[in-house]
């Protein structure tokens, strides 16, 4: 084990945990060296299971031989930076609720056609900007039977630290890919019907048999606040509304996705 006690807060090896922004980690100028940071033994383990390559660990000293030991055994030779809890809090500026972080290399982006191969139920997220919502959507997608998640390029990044944390690492379990602007054509070519979740007078019921009996179905969710673009709704086969009560007109996109995935993530 390459254990390194933290003695210098300014060591450049610690920049990834304390000083680099998410955009700097993304490293668009040199994507082969782009990184992300995973938090907690569960999430780090899921990232390793998905084949993500670790660069270094940062953890409380007690976890080196405690709950982090099994992870470290899977990563021989990877530097492990360790210190007591109060030292790590001073370094990162926040309390490590799970006691460990792991910097990892970003995997190559998946091809959307490959992600769709063999899938029958997928989610399409149009410009979902909030990483907390994005992480929650991934967790629901994993739990409720969605085979893949497709994202437009203007939305949040599934490998932002908050998105990873909220998803409980399911961003490493559910296949996902960014889609081109003409993604409705891509889905049609793969045999998918598309269901736009939107507040429209002509919306069909969530339990409409045409949806539940579709061989392949894509559930399309829009950005926070504005929802789906009119052009997107027009390009979809169905517009679907979740029934509301007590004067509530809509749900947060993360909550709405859970309802939609539960109903539509399975065939009748």
Region spans (language model):
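Amphipathic alpha-helical repeat scaffolds
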Residues: 40, 129-137, 251-256
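Short, aromatic/basic amphipathic alpha-helical patches
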Residues: 66-77, 232
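Structured adenosyl-cofactor binding patch, chiefly the S-adenosyl-L-methionine
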Residues: 100-102, 140-144, 153-172, 230-268
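Active-site/ligand-binding-proximal alpha/beta "capping" segment
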Residues: 196-248
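Glycine- and other small-residue-rich loops at beta-strand/loop junctions that grip anionic moieties
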Residues: 6, 36, 126-127, 152-153, ...
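RNA substrate-binding interface of SAM-dependent RNA methyltransferases
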Residues: 4, 105-202
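Boundary-proximal intrinsically disordered activation/regulatory segments immediately upstream
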Residues: 1-67, 155-156
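A glycine-rich helix N-cap at a beta->alpha junction
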Residues: 74-93
């Amino acid at each position: 084990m390459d254990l390194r006690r933290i003695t210098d807060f300014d060591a450049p090896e610690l920049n990834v945990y304390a000083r680099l922004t998410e955009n700097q980690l993304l490293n668009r100028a040199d994507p082969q060296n782009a990184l992300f940071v995973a938090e907690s033994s569960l999430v780090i383990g899921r990232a390793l299971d998905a084949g993500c390559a670790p660069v270094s660990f940062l953890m409380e000293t007690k976890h080196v031989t405690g709950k982090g030991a099994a992870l470290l055994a899977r990563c021989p030779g990877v530097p492990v930076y360790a210190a007591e809890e109060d030292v790590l809090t001073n370094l990162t500026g926040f309390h490590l609720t799970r006691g460990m972080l792991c910097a990892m290399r970003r995997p190559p982006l998946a091809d959307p056609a490959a992600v769709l191969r063999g899938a029958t139920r997928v989610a399409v997220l149009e410009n979902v900007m909030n990483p907390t919502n994005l992480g929650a959507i991934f967790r629901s997608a994993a739990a409720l039977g969605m085979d893949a998640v497709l994202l437009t390029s203007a939305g949040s990044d599934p490998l932002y630290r908050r998105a990873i944390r909220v998803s409980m690492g399911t961003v490493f379990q559910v296949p996902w890919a960014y889609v081109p602007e003409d993604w409705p054509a891509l889905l049609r070519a793969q045999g998918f019907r598309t269901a736009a979740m939107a507040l429209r007078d002509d919306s069909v019921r969530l339990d409409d048999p045409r949806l539940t009996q579709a061989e392949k179905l894509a559930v399309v969710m829009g950005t926070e606040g504005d929802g789906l673009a009119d052009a997107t709704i027009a390009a979809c086969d169905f517009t679907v509304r979740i029934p509301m009560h007590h004067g509530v007109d809509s749900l947060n996109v993360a909550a709405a996705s859970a309802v939609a995935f539960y109903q539509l993530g399975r065939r009748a």
